[in-house]
Structures are given as C-alpha cells and as structure tokens.
C-alpha cells in the first residue's frame, strides 16, 4: 500500500503504518516531504494521499486526477503557535511579544500554512498586530521543511510561526513551543483515496485504523488533539 503526503503529519502516519502492518501483515509505505519530491510518483501509484490542511488537499486533487475527495476523511487537528530558542532568550511568552521592536520572525508562506500568520495576527481583529508583525518578518519560508532547516542554520531568527508538532520534531534542545490562546489557529490533517485505493480493501481499512480510538494515543504523542 502506497501513501503520500507532507512532512507535518508524516511521523504519525508512519508510526500508525507500522502498527497496522503488525496487526494485518499488510505493508504500508509512507512517502512524505515537500510536494515536488513525491507528486509525480503519487500520480502513478498512490493508494492514499494525506494532507496538512484543507487547502493543501484541494490542491492535491487538482494535481492528481485519480484522487477523489468524495471519500475524504478529516483527521486530527493541531494548534499553531510560536517556536522560540531554548531557554527563551528574548522572553517571548505570547503572540504580542513577537510584535515588539527587534524581534526577528520567520513564517511559512506556502504548503499548509498559507495565510496562517495573518489569521493569527488578526484573530483579535487588531489591524495593528498585522502591521507590526509584517515589519518583523525577516524570512518567508516556502514550506515547513525549509523553515526548520533555516531555523537550524540561522541563529538570528528569534521566533517561528508554525504548527506544534514541528517543535517536537526539532527537539527540546533546539525549540520551545509557545501556544497563545488569543492567537491560536487550528487546522486538520485529511486523507483521501485514489481510484486505485478505492479498489484496495486494505487501504480503506488503514483509513479506518488511523481514525480509531487505538490510534489516538499516537496522534496525541505528536501534539495533535485526540478525537474523542
């Protein structure tokens, strides 16, 4: 079974794929990362496509003719927030702290995060928040992987607006995650079958498995909200 999608939800899907294989003896190969790295292969042989949010899935449907959104499943959600350096040297405690003078901010302006920083800045309907944030944004990364690579290589960046699970991926020695209830935005992972996947009984079973109660522990482990 061949499953493709972005890097964000991939750790969850890969761990659940191994658990599914243990239970059913059906091998699930999860290929993940920036879209250009896998989209051509996915067009040829994908059973399932997963995404990090709805606009990403809608875009996949335009690029992969065999992908059907009629049987799409909305999966778990995760919060946005701010990654800062370990020990928080700039003492960033909430969203408004990254609007202060002298804070160098990076955002992801592509993939599953188009418009995310704007949504966070304007959640309280304060126009001045976006004005200040725009002045502090130094880097617009094209996707999360590019942002994480830049974070690791550029110590001049003080704060990164991104999803919670990327802090876990970076590790405690490289990142501290700040969640501000006044700015948090939630978006959901999704999964859908191709025509090939619809004919694969095991693929449909895998979709049911990743939505199951048993799977929720794994989603939670990677900072996604459990589905009760």
What kind of feature is each model-predicted range?
Residues 65-67:
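Conserved mixed alpha/beta catalytic, RNA-binding, or beta-rich assembly cores of soluble enzyme
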Residues 1-29, 36-46, 53-62, 73-228:
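Exported/periplasmic ABC-transporter solute-binding proteins
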């Amino acid at each position: 079974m061949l499953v493709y999608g972005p890097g964000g939800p991939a750790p969850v899907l890969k761990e659940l794929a191994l658990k599914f294989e243990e239970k059913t003896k059906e091998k699930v190969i999860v290929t993940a990362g920036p879209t250009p790295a896998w989209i051509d292969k996915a067009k040829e042989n994908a059973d399932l496509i997963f995404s990090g949010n709805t606009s990403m899935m809608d875009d996949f449907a335009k690029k992969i003719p065999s992908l059907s959104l009629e049987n799409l499943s909305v999966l778990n959600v995760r919060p946005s927030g701010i990654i800062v350096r370990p020990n928080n040297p700039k003492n960033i405690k909430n969203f408004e702290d990254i609007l202060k003078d002298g804070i160098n901010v990076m955002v992801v302006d592509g993939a599953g995060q188009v418009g995310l920083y704007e949504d966070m800045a304007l959640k309280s309907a304060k126009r001045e928040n976006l004005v200040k944030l725009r002045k502090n944004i130094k880097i617009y990364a094209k996707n999360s992987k590019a942002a994480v690579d830049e974070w690791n290589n550029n110590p001049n960046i003080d704060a990164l607006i991104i999803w919670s699970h990327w802090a876990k991926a970076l590790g405690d020695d490289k990142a501290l995650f700040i969640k501000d209830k006044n700015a948090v935005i939630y978006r959901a992972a999704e999964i859908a079958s191709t025509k090939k996947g619809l004919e694969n009984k095991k693929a449909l079973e895998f979709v049911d498995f990743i939505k199951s109660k048993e799977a929720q522990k794994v989603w939670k482990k990677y900072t996604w909200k459990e589905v009760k």
